[in-house]
């Protein structure tokens, strides 16, 4: 929601400390990852990382140069990631399209079953 608003406002710089990683965790449908996903703590960490990566890919597809940064010492908080995106008007259309393709591929990989969750994630990329 926050990133969608930042995109709608055409923000030049976006700094986000992401939360709300539960959506992918509840919808994960990827048999290749069952060996990891059967352990709830590892499943959550996998979904956290995948969600943040997809958020960065989505921002890249809108013309932003993106990075995931360590926010503070990991001993202070379990989720210490900050997503940084800086709009780059010089980013080529081809680079934006590649980022969009990578975003869609990630959604389809993690959410195999055709359903509401996959459509929700894909709609964010449009």
Question: Where does each model-flagged region fall?
Answer:
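Class I S-adenosyl-L-methionine
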Residues: 1-126
């Amino acid at each position: 929601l926050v990133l969608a608003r930042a995109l709608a406002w055409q923000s030049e710089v976006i700094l986000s400390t992401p939360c709300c990683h539960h959506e992918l965790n509840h919808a994960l449908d990827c048999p290749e990852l069952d060996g990891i996903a059967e352990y709830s703590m590892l499943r959550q960490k996998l979904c956290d990382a995948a969600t943040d990566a997809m958020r960065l890919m989505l921002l890249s597809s809108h013309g932003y140069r993106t990075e995931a940064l360590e926010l503070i010492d990991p001993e202070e908080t379990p989720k210490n990631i900050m997503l940084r995106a800086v709009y780059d008007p010089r980013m080529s259309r081809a680079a934006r399209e590649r980022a969009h393709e990578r975003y869609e591929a990630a959604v389809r990989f993690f959410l195999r079953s055709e359903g509401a969750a996959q459509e929700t994630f894909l709609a964010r990329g449009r």
